[in-house]
């Protein structure tokens, strides 16, 4: 059985304490230039982890990922250029 996971973006003041983020979930990516980290955790624990992370002194802000709520199946529409029947002939 798979557990539902959701990501969150943690904006940091400094990267020195980035190792401390491991206890909140799987650290997927850390950007050294823009000073943020992407962390994945269980959906059930997301609100609790966000509250704890935002109270830490080295964290600027915490944003949840909206990917689980976005529809990823796209409807197939015909291309307008293919829709027209161009009769090339004399």
Swiss-Prot record:
InterPro entries: DUF2129. One of its GO terms (cellular component) is cytoplasm. The keyword Translocase does not apply. It is found in: Cytoplasm. It comes from the Bacteria. Keywords: Cytoplasm. Pfam families: DUF2129. NCBIfam families: PRK02886.1. Belongs to the UPF0298 family. This is UPF0298 protein BPUM_1393. It comes from Bacillus pumilus (strain SAFR-032).
């Amino acid at each position: 059985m798979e557990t539902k996971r959701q990501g969150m973006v943690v904006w940091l003041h400094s990267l020195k304490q980035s190792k401390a983020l491991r206890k909140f979930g799987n650290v997927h990516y850390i950007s050294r230039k823009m000073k943020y980290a992407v962390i994945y955790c269980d959906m059930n624990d997301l609100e609790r982890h966000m509250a704890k992370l935002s109270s830490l002194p080295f964290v600027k802000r915490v944003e949840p990922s909206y990917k689980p709520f976005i529809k990823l199946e796209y409807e197939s529409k015909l291309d307008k250029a293919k829709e027209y029947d161009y009769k090339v002939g004399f």
